[in-house]
Amino acid sequence: MTDLANQYARCQEIGGKVARLLARRSELAQTQFSQRLADATGRLVESDKPASASPAWATALDPWAGYRYAVDVAERSVLFWDTLRQRGNGFVEQARNGLRPVLHFGHELVIDGRKLARPVNYALVRLLPPDGVVIDVSKRPYVIIDPRAGHGPGIGGFKDDSQAGVALKAGHSVYFVIFFRDPEPGQTLLDVCAAEAQFVKKVCELHPDSPKPAIVGNCQGGWAAMMLASSDPDHTGPLVINGAPMSYWSGAWSEGEGDNPMRYSGGMLGGTWLASLTADLGNGKFDGAHLVQNFENLNPANSLWDKYYHLFDNADIEPPRFLDFERWWGGYYLMNREEIEWITRNLFVGNTLWSGEVRGLNGTAFDLREIKSPIILFASLGDNITPPQQAFNWVADIYGSTEEIKARGQVIVGLVHQSIGHLGIFVSGKVAKKEHQQIASVLEAIEAFPPGLYGMEIAERRGEDGETAYDVSFREYRLEEIAARLNRFERSDEQPFEAVKRVSELNQRAYELFLQPWVRMWSNETTANLQRQFHPLRAQRWALSDLNPWLAWLGPAAEAVRAKRHAEVHEETPLREFEHYGSEMFSASLDFYRAMRDAMTESAFFSFYGNLYTVERGEEAQARPAAAAGDPRDLPYVRDALASMTEGGYTEALARAACLLARRGEPLPLARLALRHELAKDYAAYLPQLPGDQWRRVRGEQEIIVRYEPEQALATLPHLLADPQDREKLLELAEKLLDDKRVQEAGPTAAQLSMLDKIRSSLPLERTPAVRTVGAMHEVPEAPAARVAPDLKEAS
């Protein structure tokens, strides 16, 4: 009886929280709607202020002005509908000739995945550089994996200012993982992962003298890249993961604003069974147009009005850009039933990709902790498809602490844009020239970072030539700090998703038992093709094309308009201002509808699944208590590191000295990283020649020792340098750095000078090098990234 009363009280509490949340969201939606109308009205009134004797409203009533505006509207209407006709013609032509990548660059086939032992509809192509661009084959190659989420490949190389364009301009060889419309029979996501591993190995073979290829994964391609790197860590270089939903249950919680409506979709639809039903209706193939429709439903104002009104308002100049983007947006690809079921069960609903439960073809689990290369995570606060929490929370899920990241030798760098939307992360030219270009410029430096969790910051400034320049810096963070900052409610909002998973499993099983046999019996290729052709997104394209005989007049009419376009009507007139005002009102109304829809969806989700979770778990469903603040020295990785304090040799001693001399809590500017790289080349003879992942593990272990037992770390340093030659070598390196003008210009801190004196005192020599009073061992360099030996870290 007590349990029942507790559950009832808990349900009442949930109901109260949901009601308050809905009220806040509704109030915010109303406020934003009212503000947009007020702003639009203010602009209209402002434009009404007379610049001459005649007020704007009087000008608007002038018959001649009305005639000119009517001509303008008529001409823009013809151009607008003709653009949609051209879009439809392009769609029909693509369907007839086969969908192709929308890559802006020429390309040549390297591997056709359809001819592999386990065939897949993927291929590896090499991008051809544009005229005037010279490729340096010794530079690190890039492999870009685009999302297979309904659309076709190529968005990462959509134009000059793109991820591919940035890498090509920098002289790198760029390879693209493309895919074809139809999946191979029986193809699975695990087959795709195995094929992508072969692609990367081929790139390594083609560039034997280059660093390991950088893998760039966009959205779905991001978690595909993570699977690839965890299954084959020896062939992958740095990973750049852009807007990838790695922890799908997580969500953003801005004050009173719903940022993540997509994460509720699986629960509101009852789980994974609907994806299976849709694939069965498609005769075993899932139509990617359904995924694109979900994206469009996220922002009805843009999908139904804004993008079309922008085309209508700028009918003279906008069509080329509109058609170029629609060529990608309107190309719909297919998946096998097995593929979409794997995605929904393991990612969208199951959220098990990070847990190690998912296994590859060889039976080995995809353990993301096995990734040896640095990982750069790029997300945006303006992304309502993959908010930063979904992009970053997996780090806290698989690493128990900052110490585990360091002990495993992992480098993880986070970069957050303040406003760009999901597609803008991959498509925006501004993002390509700023974020992606800067990421490409620092990959080699990031590879030589000591293990840990870093934030990357890009500051704009005006260069000496007047052009925009960027300053890049890094700052190290604690995992615990970042997890607390990102998750306001300590992730208690993720608990109802466990109930979603259980309901999904029940519904999936019920569908497979009672409905699936009947659906498969009645489905065939003819019915599947009919469904695809009459999907609303396809139908709206081919219906407005030359296939429609009622539009035969439109092409010639548009040509006539273009030939005698009335240029003077382009000017802003009062009637155009009224037009803009009406458009803004309609757009604001659609945004208000979206905000209320998302708020009610969120409330319904937590009302149902929150209570269901409470009933199922009982006392366990109470809010997660804050983790007890125990002694960090009790953590396994800390205990192991401290126990090995006196073990090791020159490599461990150099790493420990780097930790002892490191600057604490200061940003790490790019200029300092460049200095380290220069010093590494000049003093390579003093640096251990280790693979990068091995050095980072050594570096991480020594940093744990220095963090928790700094005095013992210094006192036991002589144990690591029992060999007099090693001791002399370390001190000789310090002397050479002292004499280096580049190091002297950097300037050590007082704390570093003091620590350097202590290190010297702890390492007496019979023949001691001349002692200086100026310390510069804080600039002990990084080894070249290809071999990656140490620097004495941020000692710079």
Regions found by a protein language model. Give the residues of each.
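Alpha/beta-hydrolase-fold enzymes
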Residues: 2-82, 205, 209, 226-341, ...
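Short, surface-exposed "cap/lid" segments of acyl-processing enzymes
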Residues: 95-183
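Conserved acidic catalytic loop of the alpha/beta-hydrolase fold
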Residues: 182-187, 194-213
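Gly/Ala-rich beta-loop-alpha elbow adjacent to hydrolase catalytic centers
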Residues: 216-225
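A catalytic-pocket lid/entrance helix-loop region that shapes and gates access to the active site
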Residues: 232-299, 404-406, 410-414, 423-443, ...
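Short beta-strand/loop motif that positions the catalytic acidic residue
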Residues: 371, 377-379, 383
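Conserved alpha/beta-hydrolase "acid-adjacent" motif
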Residues: 385-390
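Small-residue-enriched hydrophobic alpha-helices in membranes
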Residues: 616-796
